Amino acid sequence: MAKKPASTEVAIHELIAGRWSPRAYSSEPVSRDQLRAVLEAARWAPSSYNAQPWRFVVFDRSVDEVAFKKAFATLVPFNQGWNAPAPVLIAVTAHTLTSKGDVNRCALYDAGAAAMSLVLQAHALGLAAHQMSGFDVNAFRTTFELPKDVEPIAMISLGHYGDVDKLDPVLREREKAPRQRVALAEIAYGGGWKKAF
């Protein structure tokens, strides 16, 4: 896979510095063992009260093309464009109620942690993973008959890195551009809001 290491202010582990969100996919299938590994990594994410509210719906083109196409159809047109070769889509969802029926205010936070574990494991396996909010949540909910207390949060495309030159010229430029983040001083405060860390 192409490398785009983060330009960090302090040295961090390669697994984090090296993870990025590619858009160039090949159509090569992802193995069942690789899929199980990324899902196992997600399974071991931390969660409030160990509630583990996350649920992942896997759409593997090589296993069930009909279901894959239904999930793909919920992506916004822009995301459909560059995801056309992607072999796997994974919907990230979460139970928003606790086992007692109370609102789980940490459900989305916990599901995000599980999703991050999933994409870090994907990176460790040399796979490309791209998390997206650009999909029709209501269409997904209806198409796949989700229970009322299950919230669709994101879609992750997963696969092997492909040929960047097959991307649209604008996306090709973005794919090759250095990664950027705001400065550490803008996100970390010490002892109070906006106080220097």
Segment roles from a protein language model:
Residues 1-197:
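Acidic, surface-exposed loops and disordered segments
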